[in-house]
Amino acid sequence: MDGGGSSSWTHVSKNLIERRAVKGCLLPTPSDVMDAAVMALKDVTENIVGQQLFSVDRTNALSVIHTNEVPESIIATAIARDTSRDYLREYEGAAKCNLAATDLSHDEMWEVVIKRYWRYLRESSGAEVVDRGAVGQATQSVLSVLLLQSTFGKKRLSKNPFKHKGPNVGYKSNLEDLRSAFTKIEKYMYYMRPNDPMTKSEDTELRLHELLAYVTTCYRWLLWFMDLTDAKVLRNIDKGPVITHGPRESRPPDELVRRHLKSGPAISAGTGVALTLSTATADALIVLLRMSVSWTSHSWKSNTHGVTGAIVAAVELVTLIHHHLQYIINTVFAGYVCWLDGGVENSYLNSALRSQGRFDHFVGKLVPIMATLSWANMEKGTVMWFKYALAKSIVCHGSPTQHYLTVLESIASKRTGACPPQGSTFGRNPSGFPGQFCCPPQGPLPAPPNSKTRGTFRRCRPGSLRSSRQLPTSPPSNIVSPRTNPAIEGSTAAKNVQGAETIQVRSSGEFNDCIWYINGAYPHQRSDSSSSDNSTCSSTETQYITLPSTPSPTGDVVYTNPLLGPDEEVDASPQPVDPMSDYSAPKNPDYMRPRSTLVEEVWQLRDSDYTPYMRPSRPSRAGRSRVRVEDQTLEPSSPAGCNPPANSPENDSDDAAVDSPPISPEVVYGTFRPRAKCVYDQYGLTALAALSASRAKARRTRPGPTQPDVCRERDEESAEPRHDGFIRRTMSTTGPPRKHPDQTERVSSL
């Protein structure tokens, strides 16, 4: 028995440790973590996207296709089964919440639209149009009405834009056909996505080309329609345009539609892979052609209500089409750009963006543009689906594919304003894509085997990340940038293959930007219209608004500065960053933080219409000691290094000081507020100390006794005016105006 037991134990003990280690150790492997992450993303995504994307029939049909293509039969089946607009469920719910939060009645919405149009017409044509009060600026309610009412409103604001009943009935039928065509196109785009975002898909690229060409054609039609509407309005109110310029769109609608129907990307390819899509876009363009005939041939009512009713109906039509086109562009930026050859540098995408930018340049005062980040906060399903699909693709491929890296590099080149240098490309290692969990190594890096060089680890000195920030040298030309100076959203850092940080940008949260529920607007100064077809659409010509996915409890409007390279353009889920996240506080309390070596940094992060805080309302440069208004020779020279950059908003004082008329000192002193601090980067502590000491010395050595305020006021009342009409005063940074010597002697004699 003992021998048998001993023999049995010997046999069992041979692989006991191996079996226990393999079956008993539960330490997760990287593959386990990736699988769990993919499944978690799938569970979240299934609840907020259209059910047809995860249907059994679609999954089985795509499983037997060994290419990254989706046949049109699968797309058509998903479109037919989605009878309740399931693809738009999340977005439509958020839009209706925004409309409900406006608390505006039907008549108040009417007033919002008509007042907005009168202001737009006055600024675009120069006609003397009476504006009945302010438009309410760019508040949340106004922007919600202008963007969402025509698409998700319960009923139309203006039902009878024409004079006779027949044209009104035909117009209602055309609107229903147009909405049906828009829904079919949006469904097609929603369900045409392949399963792998990191693999090229030629069929999907062709369909995207067809959609983007369709967007370009529609935006050109909108410019033609606004030319027609503005001309008829001015004619009906017996006004003529003061600003004379050519038509904003020179081609007639029939030529625009014919050009797309005969030579569009889907028709020109001749493959038939986008036959259903080309039919849907053709249906929408034909309806627009019928509407062109209606608005051209049918007359309006001659009374005031008839003209305003036609205006409101026209604005409703424009916002309906514009919202549909924005849906297509924002969906491309939310993920579909990965299937475009060249990424954001694709020619069809650039053409569509230019058309949208041109429309915004001329009509942006009337119709705003929604940023992709705001759109993604409302349409969460598309962004979440692409995160899930990318995670699953990385697990399958093991690393990002070259095709996907090319798309990422095209986006990075737009963000930095120039192409990345040679060698600074995204690596195929997932660690090359930094996120919120990335952190520097906490110890020396081990040297590879048989290596003669030791692994080194160098900790960043305090402030080194801040000083190494590289700002864009020029603002991106993409229309998705709402400012002249590019504002930066998201906390991202593009790294090269050596791991060196090449760009460190701030989160939009540092500009008081609410990442998830932004309920603000981005107003800006808009330049005059131009009739040139080659006019560039700079970043100062786009008005971005941001809508919350749920109504704001306070109703406050947050004016902020959104991102912009392709703003549109950043990951839709950045996290707010601590303003001091790029600076590590030193242990030594006497340590003085080094100043940034980038002189242009402060000015590049400011908006084009930025008004400096507490800027003096006189033509002297901020930071200089105050002098007499009449005696310009007493203006002291600015300390070395205190001058702002040439392109700064405060560098216009010298020119103003030459030609500006004399300013009354009473007015100057009443409106002047001392500057809290000098914001120039090169204005160091030494210069501040010297300036403060000189001012203190001037106060100590000031001649003459100090009189009480009562005597001073009594003397001013009894003083006779001089030949120049007022008593000369000297501006001081520390006290009230000093008196003229003659005035001081008179007060002393009293």
UniProtKB/Swiss-Prot annotation:
Q: What is the membrane topology noted in the UniProt record heading this document?
A: Peripheral membrane protein
Q: Where in the cell is it found?
A: Virion tegument; Host cell membrane
The record's listing under InterPro entries reads: Herpes_UL46
Task: Give the protein's recorded name.
Answer: Tegument protein UL46 homolog
Q: What are the Basic and acidic residues biased-composition ranges?
A: 710-727, 739-750
UniProt lists compositionally biased (Low complexity) regions at 528-540
Role according to the record: Modulates alpha trans-inducing factor-dependent activation of alpha genes.
Keywords per UniProt: Activator, Host cell membrane, Host membrane, Membrane, Transcription, Transcription regulation, Virion, Virion tegument
Q: What is its main location?
A: virion
Q: Which family, according to the similarity comment?
A: Belongs to the herpesviridae HHV-1 VP11/12 protein family.
Please list where the region (Disordered) is annotated: 437-484, 525-593, 610-669, 692-750
Q: Where is the composition biased (Polar residues)?
A: 465-484, 541-553
**Pfam families from the UniProt entry:** Herpes_UL46 (PF03387)
One GO biological process term? regulation of DNA-templated transcription
Query: GO CC terms for this protein?
Result: host cell plasma membrane; membrane; viral tegument
